[in-house]
């Protein structure tokens, strides 16, 4: 049976968090262009995972500078750039994503994929996960996701690793993570 015409996935990208996690936690420096996620792959994964159209919203902090070439590239990939501004002490991207998640909860329809590691969204994500008939997923690096978010997997939150599941990168990232024994390959160590 086909999905209703109104079925769609809302893909919310916390651009600041993904970039900071990649640079600060994994690379220890600003990522080079070839080390950044391929956002078209993220969009395609979001479409394919639940086999329905995707509405991509890419949240950016534009308080001090808006990288127009990047914004134009994101728009060309069918994301809607959401540049935000505010005082330096205000986490404008977090506030906007929280409000969007709350609005989606009130809306009552639409599946949600959130690309972030930030536990500040836990209460809004929990409300969506607990809503009947709604699918909710988190995109990021599993080992760096907030425990406040990952504990929601017991209630149905799906985790999608940006490197392993989404294949959003064209280079291998220097990650240290637990390897499920069924995926352990000694040849990867022996090279």
Indicate residue ranges for each PLM-predicted region.
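Nuclease catalytic cores that cleave nucleic-acid phosphodiester bonds
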Residues: 64-191
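Domain-level signal for Mg2+-assisted phosphodiester chemistry and nucleotide/NA-binding surfaces
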Residues: 1-91
């Amino acid at each position: 049976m086909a999905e209703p015409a109104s079925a769609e996935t809302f893909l919310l990208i916390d651009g600041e968090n993904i970039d900071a996690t990649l640079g600060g936690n994994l690379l220890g420096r600003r990522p080079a262009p070839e080390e950044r996620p391929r956002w078209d792959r993220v969009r395609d994964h979001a479409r394919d995972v639940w086999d329905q159209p995707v509405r991509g919203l890419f949240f950016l902090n534009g308080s001090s500078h808006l990288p127009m070439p990047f914004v134009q590239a994101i728009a060309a990939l069918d994301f809607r750039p959401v540049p935000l501004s505010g005082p330096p002490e205000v986490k404008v991207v977090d506030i906007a994503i929280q409000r969007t998640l709350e609005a989606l909860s009130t809306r009552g329809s639409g599946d949600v994929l959130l690309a972030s590691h930030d536990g500040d969204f836990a209460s809004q994500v929990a409300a969506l996960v607990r809503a009947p008939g709604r699918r909710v997923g988190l995109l990021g690096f599993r080992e760096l996701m907030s425990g406040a978010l990952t504990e929601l997997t017991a209630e149905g939150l799906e985790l999608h690793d940006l490197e392993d599941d989404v294949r959003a990168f064209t280079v291998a990232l220097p990650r240290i993570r637990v390897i499920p024994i069924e995926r352990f390959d000694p040849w990867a160590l022996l090279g």
